[in-house]
């Protein structure tokens, strides 16, 4: 099922298109040498790579960063009850402006690709494509990076389903502390197609092996293991249940523990710098990066990001070839290609740049000043 990029909802919630583009960028640097840009936000460098089996993680560190404490993450907000997520069409209770009485509102019939979100906190909510919310009629993932302002009207939220076999009332939506692995996240963030999201959930990895690549060992996470997990523990094809199942979850856990141990060892001696992101390679191919505006923000996402990278690594063939630091620096150059923007004035701007097989996506907060909260670069698999 293809999802429409723009829709009209209820009482006229509008999407805005912005003509401007994000101006904050990141420039690669040699280990130990600050980046070439003079701006504080460009002052970062790559540490030595952390490698385990077919996964290589290049830590990105910075001596400067933005204060991001004003922003609320999905996990924080759901755990504290500062946001409410409901199925579209369910009665949603909100307070009117004078806060004297509740006002019931409905937003049409339930929809696979739409939820309703209310930000009741005093902080803007940051959402990343691929973050999972569990419950409702089926588990969903956030469709696109965005910011939800505090005190806003109930928001029709674009999502993708990652539980193909269920459409029935379940528990209230809750924090899953999960972001789907890159093969699934790409389908949401770039391709924006529900059928492709469903297919990628049970495919493991959708990356295709290059004909020029050297011979590789079979993936540790086989199609048979995924099918067994679906058969025995995840009959509704729930992403969360598949990748936390006995057939798969144990392998992911041990993989994550070893990478985390090596990562901590590499980053433990930092003085005056913080890890703000990572560049990810599988075998010799640099494939992915997530960089944040501050070390604090990176820390909040790191555990679930690492698990997502590990799932992808286990689903890909094991190649002996390793990516170099120069490969990672080249991968992080600012792209020069077709640009697409979306914006909510005074709240956020979303920018995508496409060049060849690469996509760069930036989420800018526009208040209290313009900063790039998150920057994603990925090598598309199709």
What are these regions (language model features)?
Residues 21-30:
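Hydrophobic h-region of N-terminal signal peptides that target proteins for export
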């Amino acid at each position: 099922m293809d999802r429409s990029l723009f829709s009209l909802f209820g009482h006229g919630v509008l999407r805005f298109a912005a003509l401007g583009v994000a101006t904050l960028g990141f420039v690669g640097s040699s280990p130990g040498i600050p980046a070439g840009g003079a701006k504080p936000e460009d002052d970062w460098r790559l540490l030595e790579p952390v490698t385990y089996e077919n996964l290589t993680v290049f830590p990105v560190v910075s001596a400067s960063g933005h204060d991001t404490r004003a922003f609320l993450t999905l996990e924080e907000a759901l755990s504290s009850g500062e946001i409410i997520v409901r199925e579209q069409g369910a009665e949603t209770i909100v307070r009117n402006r004078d806060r004297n009485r509740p006002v019931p509102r409905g937003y049409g019939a339930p929809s696979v690709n739409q939820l309703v979100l209310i930000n009741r906190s005093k902080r803007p909510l940051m959402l990343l494509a691929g973050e999972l919310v569990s419950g409702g009629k089926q588990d969903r993932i956030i469709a696109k990076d965005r910011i939800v302002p505090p005190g806003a009207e109930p928001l029709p939220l674009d999502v993708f389903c990652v539980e193909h076999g269920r459409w029935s009332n379940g528990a209230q939506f809750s924090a899953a502390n999960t972001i789907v692995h890159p093969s699934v996240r790409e389908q949401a963030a770039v391709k924006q197609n529900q059928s492709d999201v469903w297919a990628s959930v049970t495919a493991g990895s959708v990356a295709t092996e290059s004909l020029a690549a050297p011979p590789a060992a079979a993936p540790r996470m086989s199609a048979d293991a995924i099918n067994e997990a679906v058969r025995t523990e995840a009959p509704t094809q729930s992403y969360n249940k598949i990748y936390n199942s006995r057939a798969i979850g144990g392998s992911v856990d041990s993989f994550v523990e070893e990478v985390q141990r090596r990562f901590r060892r590499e980053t433990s001696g930092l003085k005056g710098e913080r890890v703000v992101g990572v560049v990810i390679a599988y075998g010799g191919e640099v494939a992915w990066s997530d960089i944040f505006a501050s070390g604090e923000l990176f820390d909040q996402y790191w555990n679930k990001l690492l698990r997502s990278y590990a799932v992808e690594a286990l689903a890909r063939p094991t190649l002996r070839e390793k990516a170099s630091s120069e490969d990672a620096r080249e991968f992080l150059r600012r792209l020069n290609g077709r640009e697409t923007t979306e914006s909510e004035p005074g709240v956020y701007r979303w920018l995508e740049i496409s060049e060849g097989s690469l996509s760069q996506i930036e989420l800018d907060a526009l208040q209290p000043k313009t900063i790039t909260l998150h920057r994603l670069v990925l090598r598309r698999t199709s």
